[in-house]
Each structure stands twice: as structure tokens, then as C-alpha cells.
Swiss-Prot record:
A cellular component term, taken from the record's GO annotations: cytoplasm
Swiss-Prot/TrEMBL site (Transition state stabilizer) positions: K162
Signal peptide residues on this chain, from the entry's feature table: none
InterPro entries, A to Z: Amidase/PGRP_sf, Amidase_domain, NAMLAA_amidase_2
Cofactor, free-text remark: Zn(2+) is required for amidase activity.
N-acetylmuramoyl-L-alanine amidase domain boundaries: 29-167
Function description: Involved in cell wall peptidoglycan recycling. Specifically cleaves the amide bond between the lactyl group of N-acetylmuramic acid and the alpha-amino group of the L-alanine in degradation products containing an anhydro N-acetylmuramyl moiety.
Coiled coil: none
Highest taxon above the source species: Bacteria
Location of the protein in the cell: Cytoplasm
Source organism per UniProt: Salmonella typhimurium (strain LT2 / SGSC1412 / ATCC 700720)
Protein name per UniProt: 1,6-anhydro-N-acetylmuramyl-L-alanine amidase AmpD
Main enzyme class: hydrolase
């Protein structure tokens, strides 16, 4: 799963136009976990790809009319079945965090990687999603070691606006999978 010029080899690539360059000499040092479902609470359709590529049809669902104007992206999406979709290379700045602050640092998009989990705040995430998120995180830590100590939810960097990944996300389970996997690789 090693990155190929910022792309995961095993991910399905759906390049987004919604990204730009990070500030000079800025390497990713933060992982931000998000959730998304389009329409809200529905899974498996083409709508997340459409949102992140700027091609969502505002007439396809009433909710889409509210979001069709957005220019947003994440680096990756992990679907319910564990499929990884990548929209933006990791060395580029995806537009996932918005107005944000992490430990006193503003503009989290400048120094973070955003990974979306297909889901909602209150529905349990799947085992496949945890396994893939841990695998991607290990890969990221190998290239960007500071991420090991800086993993958070969207809700923690934008607490007045966002709630994801929500109470359904099992942080201890995720951190244990990352640690267990990292330990296996060292032995």
C-alpha cells in the first residue's frame, strides 16, 4: 500500500479538482477522521465521488441542492465494504477541514490529511473500515511520522460546526489497530 507519488497503489483513483499545494516546506503532521453519507444516511451510491469532483447533480436529491455549490474534497474515502477511494495526493492540500484549529494552529488543511469514512455519527463503522483506516494510517506514518501523535476527528478541530466522526467511532479500537499493526511490522 505504499504511496505512488502521493497516491495509494491499492486505492481507486478519482482525481478531484478541489485541492491545491500546501505551503512551502509543509508536510502532513495531522490525520483528521471524518464521516460522510450522501444522501444523509444512505450508502454505496456515486454521490460522494460526485461531490468531491464537483459534478453532483443538485436535482438528484433535495439535499444535493444545498451542497452542490461546495468545493470540497478529502484525500481518501473508506467505504462500508473497505474499498479505498483516493481523490487528492497526500502531498497536496485537500479541502476537507474548513475553518479549523488544532492545538492552537489554524488552517488545518495546510498540514493535515483528511480521511472520510462512509457512515454517520451514530451508526457503527464496519470492521473493514477500521482495518483499512489502520492500514492507511500506518502507511501515512511511515512517510509522515508526526501523524503518529496527531490523529483527531473533524469535531475536534471545528467543534462549533462539525460532529463527525461522532460517538459511533471507536477511537481506542482504531488506535489499538494502528499500534498492533505497527508492532507487527517491527518484529
Amino acid at each position: 500500500m505504499l504511496p505512488d507519488k502521493g497516491w495509494l497503489v491499492e486505492a481507486r483513483r478519482v482525481p478531484s479538482p478541489h485541492y491545491d499545494c500546501r505551503p512551502d516546506d509543509e508536510k502532513p503532521s495531522l490525520l483528521v477522521v471524518h464521516n460522510i453519507s450522501l444522501p444523509p444516511g444512505e450508502f454505496g451510491g456515486p454521490w460522494i465521488d460526485a461531490l468531491f469532483t464537483g459534478t453532483i447533480d443538485p436535482d438528484a436529491h433535495p439535499f444535493f441542492a444545498e451542497i452542490a455549490h461546495l468545493r470540497v474534497s478529502a484525500h481518501c474515502l473508506i467505504r462500508r465494504d473497505g474499498e479505498i477511494v483516493q481523490y487528492v495526493p497526500f502531498d497536496k492540500r485537500a479541502w476537507h477541514a474548513g475553518v479549523s484549529n488544532y492545538q492552537g494552529r489554524e488552517r488545518c488543511n495546510d498540514f493535515s490529511i483528511g480521511i472520510e469514512l462512509e457512515g454517520t455519527d451514530t451508526l457503527a463503522y464496519t470492521d473493514a473500515q477500521y482495518q483499512q483506516l489502520a492500514a492507511v494510517t500506518r502507511t501515512l506514518i511511515a512517510s509522515y511520522p508526526a501523524i503518529a501523535d496527531n490523529m483527531t476527528g473533524h469535531c475536534n478541530i471545528t467543534p462549533d460546526r462539525k460532529t463527525d466522526p461522532g460517538p459511533a467511532f471507536d477511537w481506542p479500537r482504531f488506535r489499538a489497530l494502528v499500534a498492533l499493526s505497527s508492532h507487527k511490522e517491527m518484529t
